[in-house]
Amino acid sequence: MFKKIAADALGLSDIGKIIEPQDYDKTDADDYVMHEDNEKIYFLIKTKADEYCFTNLALIHVDGERATSSKRTLKRYPYSQYKISDVFLETAGKVDLDVEIKFKLGGEQFDIDVHKDQIEKLKDLYKALLRIAETTYENDILINQAEQSLDKAVTILHHTRPEHVNIETQYKELTEFGFTWLTSVRSQYHIKDFGDVFEKYINN
């Protein structure tokens, strides 16, 4: 009930409104942020039906079936599992009341309308999402190259193995090295926390 009253106080409609940090506690999404894991809200768009909460770890979507219903479905999209791509910002024409940011998270398409007088803030989100998408794309290439390099190294060692080397011992050593190598690469390039990107573009 309190959240509904707060939504009315924020003057919400079907067109999204960017919520200021001091009002995050008036939203439903704030209840589902994993503060215990140092998760932090960086950007929040709210309509009467939906909330789109961008944290350093994930997009939290509080999905309302319709503005007149109190029923909500909580959807969480970790950036490490749902890659951001196809980020677009559509500006307003002379008679338009809203601007629109579009992007994909994994296989999900998001089209979010925001009041056009908040376009400057929306530009910051656009830049942050675009940078995350670029970083993820580049890192996927590096991870793939690392895996291919390991495969080539294993093949070369297999064909140049001296006769006196124990096959079982060599296989064990290669397996342990490969696991350590790939774990190290994944730790470096499979990013889960994009707080530094949001800090750069949202809070700067």
Swiss-Prot record:
Presence of keyword Coiled coil: yes
Coiled-coil regions listed: 109-136
Alphabetically ordered keywords of this record: Coiled coil
A Pfam short name: bPH_1
InterPro entries in the cross-refs: PHb, PHb_sf, YvbH_oligomer_dom
UniProt keyword Coiled coil present: yes
Gene3D superfamilies: 1.10.287.210, Bacterial Pleckstrin homology domain
Protein name per UniProt: Uncharacterized protein YvbH
